């Protein structure tokens, strides 16, 4: 099982990633990955970014029942510390 550090490192290596990508990459259950992402976000190590679905070819992702579950609208990346 991956640790918080391994999850953070996986995000760092890819630049940004969504929970599904990380779940598959680290062979971890999605609910566990989501909980770990929330923890890293609360710790200030990563940031949660909601993507705009306006780039969808049909423009209907926001109202499509399948789109709400299958279109990834949230990605995570390392937080810039200035």
From Swiss-Prot:
Name of the featured protein: Probable [Fe-S]-dependent transcriptional repressor
Family per record: Belongs to the FeoC family.
Disulfide bonds: none
Known function: May function as a transcriptional regulator that controls feoABC expression.
SUPFAM superfamilies: Winged helix' DNA-binding domain (SSF46785)
Residues given in the record as iron-sulfur cluster binding sites: 56, 61, 64, 71
Keyword Repressor: yes
Keyword Transcription regulation: yes
UniProt keyword annotations, A-Z: DNA-binding, Iron, Iron-sulfur, Metal-binding, Repressor, Transcription, Transcription regulation
Any one GO molecular-function label of the UniProt entry: DNA binding
Organism: Yersinia enterocolitica serotype O:8 / biotype 1B (strain NCTC 13174 / 8081)
Domain of life of the native organism: Bacteria
């Amino acid at each position: 099982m991956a640790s918080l550090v391994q999850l953070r490192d996986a995000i760092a290596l890819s630049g940004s990633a969504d929970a599904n990508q990380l779940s598959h990459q680290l062979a971890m259950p999605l609910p566990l990955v989501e909980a770990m992402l929330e923890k890293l976000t609360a710790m200030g190590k990563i940031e949660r970014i909601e993507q705009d679905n306006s780039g969808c070819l049909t423009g209907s992702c926001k109202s499509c029942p399948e789109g709400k579950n299958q279109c990834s609208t949230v990605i995570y990346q390392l937080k810039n510390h200035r």
